[in-house]
Swiss-Prot record:
Organism: Candida albicans (Yeast)
GO terms for MF: ATP binding; phosphoenolpyruvate carboxykinase (ATP) activity
Lineage, uppermost ranks: Eukaryota, Fungi, Dikarya, Ascomycota, Saccharomycotina
Gene name, Swiss-Prot/TrEMBL: PCK1
InterPro entries named in the record: PEP_carboxykinase_ATP, PEP_carboxykinase_C, PEP_carboxykinase_N, PEPCK_ATP_CS
Protein name per Swiss-Prot or TrEMBL: Phosphoenolpyruvate carboxykinase (ATP)
HAMAP family, A to Z: PEPCK_ATP
Keywords of this entry: ATP-binding, Decarboxylase, Gluconeogenesis, Lyase, Nucleotide-binding
């Protein structure tokens, strides 16, 4: 049989989806010549072939594509910029999170990215959706020069059917990823050779100076944090979500990177809805993504079997260390970065619910990873406490989640997602307050951090995953509602005195502390003061009840 031949936007003799026609709208829009090969919506085997041509890319012993993201192995939040333009400027929460960049600077960066992409012999284009609910989903197009980036976004977004691709049309949002090429440091507003810029008027994003794939994922998340509340009055959440198999009960886990969202939501006894990004509309909760982006440091089949078994053909391993001959990954090796990751389609998780659209009203878990060791492993929250701790967004920034973060340290991230917020945090907090008031759902503060002592003092340890899972099981079964509770001083949080499968001494931080009473009191008062200082930013817009729900500083 003769090999297939190239016809317009069909396939070339190698069997790869390509575009060669000068009449193709994409070719015309990018001003490409016919010598440029465009892999348009290429399947994983094709992207593997192209990816293996990239320096340092290979296949793991389990079949995953292993790639390196260059000098940047985490997000660069200090280089994130929003274009200051007339249609969106009045809504933006300007400041350290959303840095302003002028329209002229945007045009220079966009032209720079496109000029770089035009020099490539081969480009990759991915068309996909963000948002599982058809009422709210947006069409996304990624144009990039690395097969690794194309496969990453193919995994992370919602993959259209063949029929949907035929009728895809023009995207609602486009990403130009020219991350191998630096930004112009002499342009107004630039502070480094890295720039991640979003233009809400043009609905486009430009990436320069970083090859870290997570910038694309979080760029789309930022867009949803803007579009959903403004256009649809839908709440966007930095959370994971799962659903009980028998009862159908839905759980939301709020938290920053490294606090346990992905790990805790991947539960064999529950259906996975998503591990990181969700929206909550009047229809219920829906996942924004079509994949999972799991941390891999110290990953094992025993501790996290569903994630471990998802690292197979079609998945991407990012910045991991492996044996040169056998290609077996050493998940305990952090010599490249603490932020080793794996990206895979959500349906690689056997317990995933497809489509990712639960309908029951969820109960909430506000996840924190407390590096001071003074917060309880689990606390039941009042509605006012939910508001206070959601606005505060306290956790410890985990090693490797951002450039330069090498050990855990205390941080406050409004709404547990401050790096991705576009509007003022109180706007999201008010949306959550409305949901709480409407549904009267249960809420818990779950601490996956240190027990017995602070990281700085030593002598403590991170709460074992098996105990955190036992606490969750007790909540889901209703067992934790039957036990007695006691109030922990200063933070005035109610903690259980017992929990099936969990040693009682680790439930109350005052009893678990190993460094003496004076040391504990000093540590908890120090943390309470940090809470109070942080909340001053939002106090003028908070109710008296919410302000009173904070710790006694």
């Amino acid at each position: 049989m003769a090999p297939p031949t190239a016809v317009g936007s069909s396939i070339n003799f190698e069997g790869h989806p390509t575009i060669k026609s000068t009449q193709d709208p994409l070719v015309q829009k990018l001003s490409l010549n016919t010598d440029t090969v465009i892999r348009h919506n290429a399947p994983p085997p094709t992207l593997y072939e192209d990816g293996l041509l990239e320096k340092g890319t290979t296949i793991s012993s389990t079949g995953a594509l292993m790639a390196y993201s260059g000098n940047k192995t985490g997000r660069s939040p200090k280089d994130k910029r929003i274009v200051d333009e007339s249609t969106s400027s009045h809504n933006i929460w300007w400041g350290p999170v959303n840095k302003q960049v002028g329209e002229l600077t945007w045009e220079i960066s966009r032209s720079r990215a496109l000029d770089y992409l035009r020099t490539r012999e081969k480009l990759f284009v991915v068309d996909a959706y963000a948002g599982w609910d058809p009422s709210y989903r947006i069409k996304v197009r990624i144009i990039c020069a690395r097969a690794y980036h194309a496969l990453f976004m193919t995994n992370m977004l919602i993959r259209p059917t063949e029929e949907e691709l035929k009728n895809f049309g023009e995207p609602d949002f486009t990403i130009y990823n020219a991350g191998q090429f630096p930004a112009n440091i002499h342009t107004k507003g630039m502070t480094s050779a890295t720039s991640v810029e979003i233009n809400f008027k043009d609905m486009e994003m430009v990436i320069l100076g970083t090859e870290y794939a997570g910038e694309m994922k979080k760029g789309i998340f930022t867009v949803m944090f803007y579009l959903m509340p403004i256009k649809h009055k839908v709440l966007t959440l930095h959370s994971s979500c799962n659903q009980g198999v028998e009862k159908g009960d839905v759980t939301l886990f709020f938290g920053l990177s490294g606090t346990g969202k992905t790990t805790l939501s991947a539960d064999p006894q529950r259906k996975l809805i998503g591990d990181d990004e969700h929206c909550w509309s009047d229809n219920g909760v829906f996942n924004i993504e079509g994949g999972c982006y799991a941390k891999c440091l110290d990953l094992s089949a025993e501790k996290e079997p569903e994630i471990f078994n998802s690292i197979k053909f079609g998945a991407i391993l990012e910045n991991v260390v492996y044996x040169x001959i056998t290609k077996v990954v050493d998940y305990g090796d952090s010599s490249i970065t603490e932020n080793t990751r794996c990206a895979y389609p959500i349906d690689f998780i056997p317990s995933a619910k497809i489509p990712c659209l639960p309908t029951p009203i969820p109960q909430y878990y506000l996840l924190t990873c407390d590096a001071s060791g003074v917060l309880a492993t689990v606390s039941k929250l009042t509605n006012a406490q939910v508001m206070y701790h959601f606005i505060s967004g306290y956790t410890s920034k985990m090693a490797g989640s951002e450039e330069g973060v090498t050990e855990p340290h205390a941080t406050f991230s409004a709404c547990f997602g401050q790096p991705f917020l576009v509007l003022h945090p109180m706007k999201y907090a008010q949306q959550l307050a409305d949901k709480i008031s409407e549904h009267n759902a249960n809420a818990w503060l779950l601490n996956t951090g240190w027990v017995g002592s602070s990281v700085a003092q030593g002598g403590g340890k991170r709460c074992p995953l098996k105990y955190t899972r036992a606490i969750l099981d007790a909540i889901h079964s209703g067992e934790l509602s039957k036990v007695e509770y006691e109030k922990v001083p200063v933070f005035n949080l109610n903690v259980p005195t017992s929990c099936p499968g969990v040693p009682s001494e680790i439930l109350n931080p005052t009893k678990a502390w190993t460094q003496g009473t004076d040391s504990f009191n000093k540590e908890i008062k120090s943390l309470a003061t940090k809470f109070a200082e942080n909340f001053k930013t939002y106090a003028d817009q908070a109710t008296a009840e919410v302000k009173a729900a904070g710790p006694e500083a």
